[in-house]
Amino acid sequence: VHWTAEEKQLITGLWGKVNVADCGAEALARLLIVYPWTQRFFASFGNLSSPTAIIGNPMVRAHGKKVLTSFGEAVKNLDNIKNTFAQLSELHCDKLHVDPENFRLLGDILIIVLAAHFTKDFSPDCQAAWQKLVRAVAHALARKYH
């Protein structure tokens, strides 16, 4: 993926404002609520019976933070996203058998969460840069499937 200087600035500038714990928890909770079939990968998380239960679930919150922390590695390694996610791709493909479409869905949800949290900063140019990033991450995570 080729990044312009402006795209890199838009991504890193916004990322510096992100509360990884809060945005990660919200993104994963939204994924589980909006796309309930994704819950099957999180059966060990306990009560996922309602939106309130999901939002209040400490395991969802902790894993959301873990997911977004990992996403931060993409921000730090924009020029090497494929290698950054090689091990996670293998884990999600070989051991967890996650449908790679779910990576795209989570990326789209992350865009919504960022837009909701950073309305003033989330210009169309910023959205385009982030959309490019979430697609690159989803592609890197799905790489082991091909």
Swiss-Prot record:
| Limits of the Globin domain | 2-146
GO cellular component, as recorded: blood microparticle; haptoglobin-hemoglobin complex; hemoglobin complex
The answer to whether UniProt assigns keyword Magnesium to this entry is: no
Q: Look up and give the organism this protein is from.
A: Aquila chrysaetos (Golden eagle)
Function statement: Involved in oxygen transport from the lung to the various peripheral tissues.
Name used for this protein in its record = Hemoglobin subunit beta
- In what tissue types does this protein appear? Red blood cells.
Which residues are heme b-binding? 63, 92
What PROSITE patterns is this protein classified in?
GLOBIN (PS01033)
Question: Which UniProt keyword terms apply here?
Answer: Heme, Iron, Metal-binding, Oxygen transport, Transport
Q: How does it assemble?
A: Heterotetramer of two alpha chains and two beta chains.
Q: Give the signal sequence positions.
A: none
Hey, which family's this protein in?
A: Belongs to the globin family.
Name of encoding gene: HBB
Q: Cite the GO molecular-function annotations of the record.
A: haptoglobin binding; heme binding; metal ion binding; organic acid binding; oxygen binding; oxygen carrier activity; peroxidase activity
- What GO biological process, any one, is recorded here? hydrogen peroxide catabolic process
